């Protein structure tokens, strides 16, 4: 084995005998300084979610226990600084053997920040960020990491602590955040020198290659350098055991671009203070070598590095602080994409005091000084040598470099040992003065600065002069920080100027009041602020900040200066709001519990709807302003435009684009005076701020948004006014305009606020509807009260208009129709609102009021109207109009809701009123014909003329005489207007009849007879969307059922049939009624997927094919057919009505008459009739003479591709199998065979069943 040395020609390695002139020290470039914060201050990026979680945790735990914020520290891309991202919260946990709380879910590489949240609202003097123990533990942790052999992490060279003091304000929470970090103050300067030869070892060749070890591992690498006798450099890994025995001359790094990277600084600290290095060899001037394998250079770079302090430096520490006040709004989702930015700064007037405090504590630390050369037997006992490689693989000369005492020191951690020494020394050194008092005097940044609550600027000036050292610099720092944070990502020129001003004029500016300091810092602002105005309007100082730099905070919060928050926090007589946005709210507004600064949404590009929804969430708690309130006395258009008070009658907001800080006239009409008191005298002398050229101190984007918002509001209110005027001219309308008193009374009726009552914001209701199904009680109203309903409804049902949205809907749900017999079903279907709106309104879900019941008419465009009994069900068809492609009824649209209808003419009101008046007219006669069991209403889209003819046919059949159409029409209009429904005009029908979107003739079917647990909404959209590609086929629940029971082939078949039918004649498809008793909209449901009981149940009611399809039917086959012919022959109301260029008679009127006659025929046997829910298959004779013009029964509306899901026509289904326990005839007798239907329309009977592409995007409900 010994012969290998001569064969390999290896010679013993020796350091140069002379330690002089080891390399050429001639500089070839400029000097570069190394420090963590030399080029850029450390940045903090804190997510709003983490702060909210810490605040919530502190409120729940009254003990004020410490918690933790977790994040990660990364080096910036340009390597000029570091960024700490704090995005998690950890409540911490207690460990029995540990005195302090530890995080519960800390991961390797996490940056741990101890945090305390003071909920009690302590004063500024009582809030201490660091105490003695905190400082000592932080310094020991820094020393340990620098001296150990652990992996070098820049994040462990920065010990950060947080202090959060929340204070609840009117619309959110003010957070006073104090960040205090301790880091090492040792810095280095390095100068590039000429290259030095390197021994070409495997490590050196790897580092010089294109794919070195740092690039493979994706992280930077560093190690140490020694030298041989020829003065060539030998590179060693950090973990090489020879590091502890060889003289070292410097360090090498790879995977780094620039030498000023914080990672290079950390490696220099490790080289200077590592306890595992026995001997360091410096040049004559005390320099060492840095070899940098840069990612951007092919050859290594050589630098000569010198500690800036001294040749044998000690560990020095530096304090970095930041104090900010931010405001987070209530009821706003935290924005995770835009964190809050902070900067840790060491530039302050208290640098000397901080250095003195830290030096006193650091003197207690033992071995801090690194020796140039230490003999192997004199390695410090507290060496942090935890790597076992030294014991296992290091060379073992005699005497051994690992004595017994050293091994013992490795077993016992050195941190507790240091802790004992440090605590004793610190206690002794602080016996002369109280530690808290010492830190208060010598290092005010350790304690939140005190700011007395003053009532005038004179006292403020005196107090500031009396406390020059403590208060002055801190005010400047907070002013500078607030200004810097308010600028966002803009240039930091002003920041640097203010810093320069603060540093150069430090001492003279100590006695200057902070408002004046802010005036100097805000030299860009042109206004002058009088001192006597400061106590009254502290936010005036902050209100001019946007003129210095526009505020465009995307994270729903605004920083305010430290001064502006103090009066609000503790001083009750003269409170003030911090300038969350430049709102200039007067000091008497402290009681406005519901002032909503809606600008938080405007910065995100949200629309009026979202702002109003935000208001509607938080404002109902305070229905009206406090009596001492004085809101909206500011030129801020954003606040005024969305404030409940500012939206006065006539659309004139309480602001003007050119108000320039003057108080806006808030005192409106007399009906608003009760809600909005006159401003107090203190508020009326608002000083003018800096001239803003009519932009009210806003950024251009914000001002544009406010202008557009104002324009839209004015347009909306003008349209509402026109609608109200048209309604007031209508003789059939009992009540046209709602007053404030009416609005208050109608708050329980889910009525929206009219524009005269806009000062009561608590009435903005949810635009959704709950529809009762699956209970017998919910299928019909109380028949006994039908006669009284038309008389009582006009008294209760006041139509009201809300300017909070540019949308309109109808709500005929009131206390008169909410009878005891119409309680909502437990199986209600909530249909969300999908508006067609270019504003992209995102609504907030709100519960429906208690008065909501099954009789409520939908606010949705796709929810039908339901009728109380069989009389209505047989002959009433609604003339419904919706937004485009919704296929749903729009008789539900009235100027009191929230549908986007700024462009719909006012002549819709007449048709709506005619429609609902006819309904109420039928309701009034309902109790006279109780011999016929209730079935359900057939809801169709058809013309008003058809409605009148159908009603005429019904009156002829039941009363054996014709009723004058004019009488019927007048009664219909009267009743409809009493309920506030407006009926579309025939001219609008003709205008839109070119584009047929949706039509459906939905007959009666028992949902529970199809599939157990299925309500009527499951088939509300069956076969309605094949006419237009913009349609949606099924409701979500039916889609889910189809996905559950249909195979892939069947789904593909349906999609193919749908695509084929889209190219065919849509009018033909309208007239098809599926006669196959096994389908009922589910013709492809496979019996193999059902249980035996389900199959038997469905076969019994003709829902599946069986050997005897009529085994459970009681009617003869030709019964319904003959009745249908009879109705068609004898009922003139079913005759076709020619309309414009249309050639075909309407099928709907005849279908209504036919269904009515069938119902009367069924009455003889007391068996309710179930009819097919689909509208695809057609009866041949109906096709022959009614095939040409089904378009007359459709509403033509503009296609809306934005609609992704619309509810279709739904049935109000009576459940006879539950209520009368009778067998049910599922369909009328003789209907064409499935073969005939297939010949007529190929696969159209199921072609519009569903759209597979959209179906797969909907959630499965089963």
UniProtKB/Swiss-Prot annotation:
Keywords: Cytoplasm, Cytoskeleton, Developmental protein, Phosphoprotein, Ubl conjugation. One of its GO terms (biological process) is mitotic spindle organization. InterPro entries: Sil (IPR026123). Immediate-early gene. Plays an important role in embryonic development as well as in cellular growth and proliferation; its long-term silencing affects cell survival and cell cycle distribution as well as decreases CDK1 activity correlated with reduced phosphorylation of CDK1. Plays a role as a positive regulator of the sonic hedgehog pathway, acting downstream of PTCH1. Plays an important role in the regulation of centriole duplication. Required for the onset of procentriole formation and proper mitotic progression. Residues 369-409, 454-551, 650-670, 782-804, 883-904, 925-959, 1106-1129 are annotated as: Disordered. The keyword Phosphoprotein applies. Residues 567-760 are annotated as: PIN1-binding. Changing residue 656 to A: Abolishes mitotic phosphorylation and decreases mitotic index as well as CDK1 activity. Residues 792-803, 1116-1128 have a biased composition (Basic and acidic residues). Changing residue 760 to A: Abolishes mitotic phosphorylation and decreases mitotic index as well as CDK1 activity. Disruption phenotype: Death during embryonic development between days 8.5 and 10.5. Embryos are reduced in size and display delayed development. They have axial midline defects, and randomized cardiac looping. The midline sonic hedgehog signaling is blocked in these mice. Residues 949-959 have a biased composition (Basic residues). Induction: Down-regulated during cell terminal differentiation. Accumulates during G2 phase and falls at completion of the cell cycle. It is found in: Cytoplasm, Cytosol; Cytoplasm, Cytoskeleton, Microtubule organizing center, Centrosome, Centriole; Cytoplasm, Cell cortex. The keyword NAD does not apply. Residues 220-762 are annotated as: Interaction with CPAP. The modification Phosphoserine is found at residues 733, 760, 1110. GO terms for cellular component: cell cortex; centriole; centrosome; cytoplasm; cytosol; procentriole replication complex. Ubiquitinated. Phosphorylated following the activation of the mitotic checkpoint. Pfam families: STIL_N. Changing residue 686 to A: Abolishes mitotic phosphorylation and decreases mitotic index as well as CDK1 activity. The gene is Stil. It comes from Mus musculus. Ubiquitously expressed in adult and fetal tissues. Highly expressed in hematopoietic tissues such as thymus, bone marrow and spleen. Residues 473-493, 500-512, 540-551, 883-895 have a biased composition (Polar residues). Residues 1-992 are annotated as: Interaction with RBM14. Homodimer. Interacts with PIN1 via its WW domain. This interaction is dependent on Stil mitotic phosphorylation. Interacts with CPAP. Interacts with RBM14 and this interaction interferes with the interaction of STIL with CPAP. Forms a complex with CPAP and SASS6. nteracts (via N-terminus) with CEP85; this interaction is essential for efficient centriolar targeting of STIL and subsequent PLK4 activation. This is SCL-interrupting locus protein homolog.
């Amino acid at each position: 084995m010994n012969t290998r040395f001569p064969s390999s020609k290896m010679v013993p390695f020796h350091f140069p005998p002379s330690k002089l002139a080891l390399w050429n020290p001639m500089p070839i470039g400029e000097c570069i300084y190394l420090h963590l914060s030399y080029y850029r201050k450390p940045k903090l990026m804190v997510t709003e979610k983490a702060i909210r979680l810490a605040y919530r945790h502190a409120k729940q735990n009254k003990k004020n226990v410490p918690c933790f914020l977790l994040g990660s520290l990364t080096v910036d891309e340009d390597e000029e600084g570091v960024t700490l991202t704090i995005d998690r919260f950890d409540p911490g946990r207690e460990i029995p053997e540990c005195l302090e709380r530890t995080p519960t879910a800390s991961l390797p590489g996490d940056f741990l920040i101890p945090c305390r949240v003071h909920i009690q609202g302590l004063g500024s003097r009582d809030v201490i960020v660091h105490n003695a123990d905190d400082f000592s533990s932080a310094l020991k942790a820094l020393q340990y990491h620098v001296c150990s052999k652990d992996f070098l992490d820049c994040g462990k060279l920065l010990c950060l602590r947080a202090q959060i003091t929340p204070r609840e304000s009117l619309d959110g929470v003010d957070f006073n955040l104090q960040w205090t970090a301790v880091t090492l103050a040792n810095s280095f300067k390095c100068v590039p020198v000429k290259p030095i030869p390197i021994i070409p070892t495997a490590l050196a060749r790897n580092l010089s290659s294109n794919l070195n070890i740092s690039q493979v591992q994706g992280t930077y690498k560093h190690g140490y350098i020694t030298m041989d006798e020829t003065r060539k450099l030998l590179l060693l890994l950090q973990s090489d055991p020879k590091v502890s025995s060889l003289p070292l001359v410097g360090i090498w790094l790879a995977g780094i671009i620039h030498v000023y990277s914080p990672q290079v600084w950390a490696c220099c600290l490790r080289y200077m203070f590592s306890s595992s290095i026995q001997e360091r060899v410096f040049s004559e001037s005390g320099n060492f070598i840095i070899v940098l394998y840069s990612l951007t250079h092919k050859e290594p770079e050589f630098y000569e590095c010198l500690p800036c302090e001294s040749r044998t430096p000690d560990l020095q520490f530096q304090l970095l602080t930041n104090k900010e006040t931010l405001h987070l709004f209530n009821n706003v989702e935290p924005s995770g994409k835009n964190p809050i930015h902070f900067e840790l700064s060491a530039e302050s007037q208290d640098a000397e005091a901080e250095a003195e405090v830290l030096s006193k504590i650091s003197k207690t630390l033992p071995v801090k000084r690194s020796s140039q050369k230490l003999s192997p037997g004199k390695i410090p006992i507290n060496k942090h040598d935890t790597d076992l490689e030294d014991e296992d693989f290091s060379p073992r000369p005699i005497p051994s470099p690992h004595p017994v005492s050293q091994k013992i020191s490795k077993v016992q951690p050195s941190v507790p040992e240091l802790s004992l020494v440090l605590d004793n020394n610190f206690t002794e050194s602080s016996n002369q003065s109280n530690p808290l008092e010492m830190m208060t005097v010598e290092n005010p940044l350790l304690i939140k600065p005190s700011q007395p609550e003053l009532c005038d600027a004179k006292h403020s000036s005196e107090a500031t002069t009396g406390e020059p050292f403590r208060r002055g610099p801190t005010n400047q720092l907070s002013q500078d920080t607030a200004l810097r944070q308010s600028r966002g990502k803009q240039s930091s020129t002003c920041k640097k100027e203010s810093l320069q001003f603060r540093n150069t004029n430090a001492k003279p500016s100590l006695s200057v009041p902070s408002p004046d300091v802010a005036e100097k810092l805000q030299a860009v602002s042109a206004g002058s602020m009088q001192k006597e105005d400061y106590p009254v309007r502290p936010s005036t100082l902050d209100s001019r900040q946007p003129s210095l730099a526009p505020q465009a905070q995307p994270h729903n919060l605004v920083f305010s200066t430290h001064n502006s928050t103090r009066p609000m926090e503790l001083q009750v007589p003269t409170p003030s709001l911090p300038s969350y946005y430049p709102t200039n709210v007067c000091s008497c507004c402290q009681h406005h519990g519901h002032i909503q600064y809606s600008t938080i949404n405007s910065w995100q590009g949200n629309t009026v709807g979202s702002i109003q929804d935000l208001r509607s969430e938080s404002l109902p708690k305070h229905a009206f302003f406090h009596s001492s309130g004085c809101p909206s006395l500011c030129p801020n258009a954003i606040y005024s435009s969305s404030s409940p008070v500012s939206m006065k009658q006539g659309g004139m907001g309480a602001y003007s684009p050119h108000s320039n800080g003057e108080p806006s006239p808030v005192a409106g009409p007399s009906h608003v005076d009760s809600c909005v008191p006159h401003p107090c005298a203190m508020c009326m002398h608002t000083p003018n701020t800096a001239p803003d050229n009519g932009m009210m101190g806003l950024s251009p984007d914000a001002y544009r948004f406010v202008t557009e918002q104002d324009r839209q509001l004015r347009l909306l209110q003008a349209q509402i006014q026109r609608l109200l005027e048209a309604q007031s001219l209508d003789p059939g309308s009992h009540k046209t305009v709602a007053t404030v008193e009416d609005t208050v009374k109608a708050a329980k009726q889910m009525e929206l606020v009219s524009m005269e009552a806009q000062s009561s914001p608590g009435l903005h209701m949810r635009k959704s509807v709950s529809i009762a199904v699956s209970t017998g009680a919910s299928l019909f109203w109380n028949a006994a009260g039908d006669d009284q309903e038309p008389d009582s409804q006009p008294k209760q049902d006041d139509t009201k208009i809300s300017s909070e949205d540019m949308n309109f809907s109808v709500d005929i749900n009131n206390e008169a129709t909410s009878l005891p017999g119409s309680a909502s079903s437990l199986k209600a279907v909530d249909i969300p609102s999908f508006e067609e709106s270019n504003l992209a309104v995102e609504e907030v879900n709100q519960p429906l009021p208690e008065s909501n019941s099954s009789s409520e008419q939908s606010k949705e465009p796709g929810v039908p109207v339901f009728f109380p009994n069989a009389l209505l069900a047989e002959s009433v068809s609604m003339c419904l109009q919706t937004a485009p492609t919704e296929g749903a009824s729009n008789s539900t649209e009235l100027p009191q809701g929230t549908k986007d209808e700024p462009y719909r003419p006012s002549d819709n009101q007449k048709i709506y009123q005619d429609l609902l008046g006819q309904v109420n007219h039928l309701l009034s006669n309902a109790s006279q014909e109780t011999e016929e069991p209730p079935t359900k209403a057939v809801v169709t889209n058809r013309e008003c003329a058809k409605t009148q003819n159908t009603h005429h046919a019904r009156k002829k059949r039941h009363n054996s005489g014709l009723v004058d159409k004019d009488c019927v029409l007048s009664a219909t209009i009267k009743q409809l207007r009493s309920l506030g429904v407006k009926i579309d005009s025939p001219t609008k029908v003709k205008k839109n009849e070119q584009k047929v979107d949706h039509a459906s003739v939905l007959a009666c079917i028992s949902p529970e007879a199809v599939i157990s647990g299925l309500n009527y909404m499951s088939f509300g959209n069956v076969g309605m969307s094949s006419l237009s590609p913009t349609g949606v086929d099924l409701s979500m629940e039916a889609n889910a059922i189809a996905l559950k029971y249909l195979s892939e082939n069947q789904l593909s078949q349906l999609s193919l049939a749908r695509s084929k039918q889209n190219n065919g004649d849509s009018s033909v498809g309208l007239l098809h009624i599926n006669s196959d008793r096994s389908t009922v909209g589910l013709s492809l449901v496979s019996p193999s997927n059902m249980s035996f009981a389900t199959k038997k149940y469905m076969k019994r009611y003709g829902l599946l094919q069986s050997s005897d399809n009529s085994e459970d039917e009681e009617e003869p086959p030709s019964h319904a057919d003959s009745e249908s012919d009879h109705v068609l022959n004898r009922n003139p109301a079913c005759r076709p009505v020619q309309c414009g260029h249309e050639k075909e008679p309407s099928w709907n009127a005849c279908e209504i008459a036919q269904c009515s006659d069938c119902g009367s025929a069924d009455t003889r046997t007391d068996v309710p009739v179930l009819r097919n829910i689909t509208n695809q298959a057609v009866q041949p004779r109906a096709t022959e003479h009614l095939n040409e013009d089904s378009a007359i029964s459709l509403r033509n509306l503009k296609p809306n591709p934005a609609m992704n899901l619309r509810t279709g026509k739904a049935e109000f289904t009576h459940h006879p199998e539950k209520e009368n326990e009778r067998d049910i005839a599922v369909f009328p007798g003789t209907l064409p065979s499935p073969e005939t239907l297939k010949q007529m329309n190929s696969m159209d009977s199921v072609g519009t069943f569903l759209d597979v592409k959209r179906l797969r995007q909907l959630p499965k409900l089963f």
